[in-house]
Amino acid sequence: MELEFLGTGAGVPARQRNVTSIALKLLDERNEVWLFDVGEATQHQILKTTLKPRKVKKIFLTHLHGDHLFGLPGFLSSRSFQGGDEPLTIYGPKGTEEYVRTSLKLSESHLTYALKFVVLPENGVIIDDKTFRVECAKLDHRIASYGFRIVEKDHPGELQVEKLQADGVPSGPVYARIKNGETVTLSDGREIDGRNYIGNAQKGRIVTIIGDTRNCEAITRLAENADVLVHESTFGKQEQKIARQYYHSTNINAAKVAKTAHVKRLLLTHISARYLGQAVRELQNDARDIFKNTRVVSDLDLYDIPFHGRKE
């Protein structure tokens, strides 16, 4: 599981930062990539990475402001042109489907795959399958804006082969049943409870991605105990009044959430073009005064999300 930042800027593209798009790479977990927001020129940023558009199976839009959205029609068309033929699901606020369908219709763009649209509820679970659970919550922005909590399901414990061998359980197809936790009867009449031969489950990871917002209660709930919190930081601590006026967050807002929610790592993105060089370092350092494990991300940064231990 990795996060790749395709764009980390705010408002409009800049030399140092493109507008927002984040790839959650789940290649080992389900051979997929999920995109969160698709700002203008996202597909140009993808050309600088190893990411394959056909691997993108889900797209999540935090809100419908242009710096999070204007790259979507072009990406969808290029995915089709480059051999993508598997269905793609887009999760977004009301109006997402109208925007996409209209853009494709007026440009006479024809896709080689089916699109499915899911309108985000104000709060609720939008995905719950064998490997992941995803919930969203409405935030506090000028228009409807959402945050997402992506929870990986726990990985089953490993089969303790050495223990089985020590207890004289011969290898064979029976091991598969034991790994499933079944009770099996051996040829010598012994009953083996599979649950006694499975190690502790590997606790799944949690990633929280927060769209444009002022500070609000929903953020802390979405971020609770997350391995990684990706939070917008449009402004620095000196611009708290401006941030609130424009329905955005500061680095200090984000750091306080990370501390309160007991997250493991805070990644700050959606950085205003006014912050360059030393100013970016100050954004990071000021946040670290509150929450030490903080990083201001840059375009094309790639972060691995490691496991953090097994369940007791």
UniProtKB/Swiss-Prot annotation:
It comes from the Bacteria. Homodimer. Its EC number is 3.1.26.11. Zinc phosphodiesterase, which displays some tRNA 3'-processing endonuclease activity. Probably involved in tRNA maturation, by removing a 3'-trailer from precursor tRNA. Its cofactor is Zn(2+). It catalyses: Endonucleolytic cleavage of RNA, removing extra 3' nucleotides from tRNA precursor, generating 3' termini of tRNAs. A 3'-hydroxy group is left at the tRNA terminus and a 5'-phosphoryl group is left at the trailer molecule. It comes from Latilactobacillus sakei subsp. sakei (strain 23K). The active site is at D67. Belongs to the RNase Z family. This is Ribonuclease Z.
